[in-house]
Amino acid sequence: MNYTLSTVSSATMYNSSSNITTIATTIISTILSTISTNQNNVTTPSTYENTTTISNYTTAYNTTYYSDDYDDYEVSIVDIPHCDDGVDTTSFGLITLYSTIFFLGLFGNIIVLTVLRKYKIKTIQDMFLLNLTLSDLIFVLVFPFNLYDSIAKQWSLGDCLCKFKAMFYFVGFYNSMSFITLMSIDRYLAVVHPVKSMPIRTKRYGIVLSMVVWIVSTIESFPIMLFYETKKVYGITYCHVFYNDNAKIWKLFINFEINIFGMIIPLTILLYCYYKILNTLKTSQTKNKKAIKMVFLIVICSVLFLLPFSVTVFVSSLYLLNVFSGCMALRFVNLAVHVAEIVSLCHCFINPLIYAFCSREFTKKLLRLRTTSSAGSISIG
């Protein structure tokens, strides 16, 4: 299977682009309305109750918490007593949203894996697509934890699973950006340097690069995993990141690591690759308009779903540095990070649409697989 830029028909790309744009707009509108409703319904409690998920990058270190045995531990950087974050993660709307994204992501990525296994991995692009799909499934694994946390209204799965929850999210985040970048570099080489790049655009190189990405992503995710733990606050156990005063430098390091390695470097490479691709296509005798549409679709969707998370994490770093402060600012930052996190998780089911279902070749194989399955003679492997 070769997911080249030329395998997509103009009509298919137009319809796919419109459908994906519509889906993305609907998802973001739903998220914003759900979170906005929760924000309006929140009342300031007399005692602080933390209702954050993995997205809470500020609350845990802007408040002084006290444990049940009255051994208090100070984790404040800015003294804002009883400043609630204004994000209710236990609402029915948010639970429904998590469930929907989970099933869509699971279903879409399993279909991609099934097709890849049936028709084998033949090219470096197939290898990157396989690993991108596995990365999205890692993202999908975060949702059962978030659902449990929202329904149970506290964490009772222990420290180990708490850390793995954080690890799943950030390995999935770094992997997704890395494999999107590698796929873009491969498209760049195929279009701009088609002959010179043939010796390195092989399945073997794809395997090596994929292993490197998984190792590097795990290393990049390790620091924040160390700070994720379970703590009891006012009788309720929470699983999220806790920083004490001495760990402020680590918080800033992790925030800038997310921005530099998770967005700035990949986005710079993406923009360069697609700029060169578009220039090459425009000056070539066979002006491949289908490929240009595919290029814009990839860039727009990548930025739409992943850039907001990095931007809001950067804003939370500014809060840490006291560029701005106060309860209202804290609530805004937490809400922004929370929405951006959910938007980033949505790409786990959008990616199969972009990199697979927009490909005429993939669609043919999927239909062939469905026909074979209906006949009862399908063999996966």
Swiss-Prot record:
Subcellular compartments: Host cell membrane
A molecular-function term among this protein's GO annotations: C-C chemokine receptor activity
Membrane topology, as annotated: Multi-pass membrane protein
UniProt-listed Gene3D superfamilies: Rhodopsin 7-helix transmembrane proteins (1.20.1070.10)
Signal sequence segment: none
InterPro entries, per database record: CCR1-9-like, Chemokine_rcpt, GPCR_Rhodpsn, GPCR_Rhodpsn_7TM
Keyword set includes Transmembrane: yes
Spans traversing the lipid bilayer: 92-112, 127-147, 166-186, 207-227, 252-272, 295-315, 337-357
PANTHER family: C-C CHEMOKINE RECEPTOR TYPE 8, CELL ADHESION MOLECULE
Primary role: Putative chemokine receptor.
Protein name: G-protein coupled receptor homolog Q2/3L
Taxonomic source organism: Sheeppox virus (strain KS-1) (SPPV)
Organism classification: Viruses, Varidnaviria, Bamfordvirae, Nucleocytoviricota, Pokkesviricetes
